[in-house]
Swiss-Prot record:
Gene3D superfamilies: Vaccinia Virus protein VP39, Winged helix-like DNA-binding domain superfamily/Winged helix DNA-binding domain
Tissue spec: Specifically expressed in conidia.
Organism superkingdom: Eukaryota
DNA-binding region: 105-124
Name of protein: Trypacidin cluster transcriptional coactivator tpcD
UniProt induction comment: Expression is positively regulated by the transcription factors brlA and laeA.
Cysteines engaged in disulfide bonds, as pairs: none
Function: Transcriptional coactivator; part of the gene cluster that mediates the biosynthesis of trypacidin, a mycotoxin with antiprotozoal activity and that plays a role in the infection process. With tpcE, coregulates the production of trypacidin.
Domain named HTH iclR-type: residues: 75-144
PANTHER family noted in UniProt: MONODICTYPHENONE CLUSTER TRANSCRIPTIONAL COACTIVATOR MDPA, PUTATIVE (AFU_ORTHOLOGUE AFUA_4G14580)-RELATED
Length: 437
C-alpha cells in the first residue's frame, strides 16, 4: 500500500473509531466536561480495543506525516516535559496544590519553597500538554491529568524513576559500549554503573534501596514492562471448562503473581495446588496463598511429586534472563517424565514479556516491548527472551524415545505475552495430539 493510500485509510479508521468511542461514552452517560481520559477505565474490553486501534492509527499517521524537524522538536519537548515533571516532583509542588481548588502561583510558590517566576514558567509549559491549568491569570489548578499524579502515587514514582534513573542511564549507553564493548555477562559493566559511578549491580541496588525498587516497579507498571497481570489475562483464556474435576498444579516463581486464586474463583470444581519454587539466590514470596486449597514448597528442578494432574502451569517470570532461561529449562526437565508417562497431561508455560519478530505485532506494542528490552540492557546488561527462543528450549528437552513439543500457542491480543501448551510426543508422531488451550 502506497503512503497516500495509507494516509487516507488510517484517517478513515481514526474517524470511525472516534465515532464509536463517542457513541459509547454518550450511551454510558460519561461526563465529557471533567475527564481524566475520554474512555473510562471500566469500559468493556471491546471499547478498550477500539481505543487501542485508534491510538495505533494515530501513531501511524504521525509516522507518515512527521518531518525530520518535527522529530527534533518532539524530542526537545519531551525532554523539557520530563525535566519539569521531575522538578515538580522533587519539590512536592503537586501535593501542595488542592485537588479541587485554585490557588495563586505566588501562594503555591511559598508553600513549595520555590521561586515564583520559575514555577510560573514551568507550569505554563506543562499546561501546553494538558498537565495543570491556569483558570485565570496568575492562578493554577489541577487538570484531570495532573490530579491523577496525586491520587495515584505510582504515576509519580514512574516519572521520577524515568527522570532520575532511566534517562540518565540511557544517555550513557554509547559510553558503556565504548568502554565495555559487548560485556553481556557482566552486571556491573553497564550504562547504569557509568551514570551513577558505582559498582553495585542494578538489581542489587533495588534490593538495598526500597525507594528505588518501588519506583522501578512503578516504571514497569506504567510502561508495559510488568507482565504479571498479562499472565493472568492470558491464562484466563485457557479452556478450563473441559477439565471437570481435574487437578491443576501451578509452579510459581519468586516474583510471579499466582493465577490460582483467580482461576479457583472462576472454576471451583477444579483442584488447585500451588508449588512455590525456591530459586537459588532468588527472593521468596512474602506470604503463602492462604485462600488456595493446597500450597507446597518445592526446590527448583526437584522431582514433581504430583503425577496425576491434568495441567501443570509454569509461571516463573519475571526474572533476569539468565535466571529465567535456566529456571525454565530446569523445570521442563523436571516435568519431562511426568508428561511422558501421561500423554493426556499438558504443561502450560508462560515467561512474561517476549520479544516479537520485527514487525510481527502492532507497532505500538512492539515499541513498548523494545523500550523495556533496551532499559534492561542499559540498567543490567539483561534482555527479554524471544518467543522462538523459548520454543526451541522446549523442543530441546528429549530422550531417545520422544521430546517435549509445543502443541499450541495462546497469544493475548495487543501484547507479546503468550502461553505455550506443551505435551510429550514420541518421535515419529505429528501434532495429532494437539488440543486447544
Amino acid at each position: 500500500m502506497d503512503s497516500i493510500t495509507q494516509l487516507e485509510a488510517r484517517a478513515n479508521e481514526v474517524a470511525a473509531a472516534a465515532r464509536r468511542l463517542a457513541e459509547y461514552c454518550r450511551n454510558a452517560r460519561v461526563d465529557g466536561a471533567c475527564l481524566p481520559a475520554v474512555v473510562p477505565s471500566e469500559a468493556p474490553r471491546a471499547i478498550r480495543e477500539i481505543q487501542r486501534l485508534l491510538l495505533s492509527n494515530v501513531d501511524h499517521l504521525q509516522i507518515l506525516l512527521t518531518e525530520p524537524a518535527d522529530l527534533v522538536q518532539r524530542l526537545a519537548v519531551q525532554s523539557q516535559l520530563l525535566s519539569c515533571l521531575q522538578w515538580l516532583g522533587e519539590f512536592q509542588v503537586l501535593a501542595c496544590l488542592p485537588l479541587t481548588d485554585t490557588v495563586s502561583i505566588a501562594d503555591l510558590a511559598r508553600l513549595s519553597g520555590v521561586p515564583e517566576a520559575q514555577l510560573a514558567r514551568i507550569i505554563r509549559f506543562t499546561i501546553t500538554i494538558g498537565f495543570l491549568q491556569e483558570p485565570q491569570r496568575g492562578h493554577v489548578a489541577h487538570s484531570p491529568l495532573s490530579s491523577l499524579f496525586v491520587s495515584r502515587p505510582s504515576l509519580r514514582d514512574a516519572v521520577m524513576f524515568l527522570a532520575d534513573s532511566a534517562a540518565p542511564t540511557a544517555l550513557q549507553m554509547a559510553s558503556a559500549t565504548g568502554r565495555f564493548g559487548d560485556t553481556v555477562a557482566s552486571e556491573t559493566d553497564t550504562a547504569y554503573n557509568i551514570a551513577f559511578d558505582h559498582r553495585d549491580p542494578f538489581y542489587f541496588a533495588c534490593e538495598q534501596r526500597p525507594k528505588l525498587q518501588r519506583r522501578w516497579s512503578a516504571y514497569l507498571q506504567h510502561t508495559g514492562g510488568d507482565a504479571r497481570d498479562l499472565t493472568q489475562q492470558v491464562l484466563s483464556r485457557v479452556d478450563w471448562f473441559n477439565l471437570n474435576n481435574a487437578c491443576v498444579v501451578e509452579v510459581l516463581g519468586p516474583q510471579s503473581q499466582s493465577v490460582t486464586m483467580m482461576l479457583d474463583q472462576l472454576h471451583p470444581m477444579l483442584h488447585f495446588i500451588v508449588q512455590e519454587a525456591r530459586i537459588p539466590n532468588g527472593s521468596t514470596h512474602a506470604a503463602l496463598h492462604q485462600d488456595v486449597r493446597s500450597v507446597q514448597i518445592r526446590e527448583l528442578g526437584g522431582p514433581q511429586r504430583v503425577r496425576d494432574a491434568a495441567i501443570y502451569i509454569l509461571n516463573l517470570g519475571p526474572l533476569p534472563h539468565a535466571i529465567l532461561s535456566t529456571s525454565v529449562l530446569t523445570e521442563l526437565r523436571a516435568h519431562f517424565s511426568v508428561l511422558a508417562a501421561n500423554s493426556c497431561a499438558m504443561l502450560i508455560l508462560t515467561a512474561g514479556l517476549l520479544l516479537p519478530k520485527p514487525g510481527a505485532v502492532d507497532a505500538r506494542v512492539e515499541t513498548s516491548v523494545r523500550l523495556h528490552d533496551l532499559s534492561l540492557l542499559q540498567l543490567a546488561n539483561d534482555r527479554l527472551m524471544e518467543e522462538d527462543e523459548l520454543v526451541e528450549m522446549v523442543h530441546g528437552v528429549k530422550d531417545s524415545v520422544g521430546r517435549l513439543a509445543v502443541v499450541n500457542r495462546l497469544h493475548l491480543p495487543c501484547t507479546t505475552t503468550v502461553a505455550l501448551g506443551v505435551r510429550y510426543q514420541a518421535f515419529g508422531h505429528g501434532d495429532s495430539s494437539a488440543k486447544s488451550l
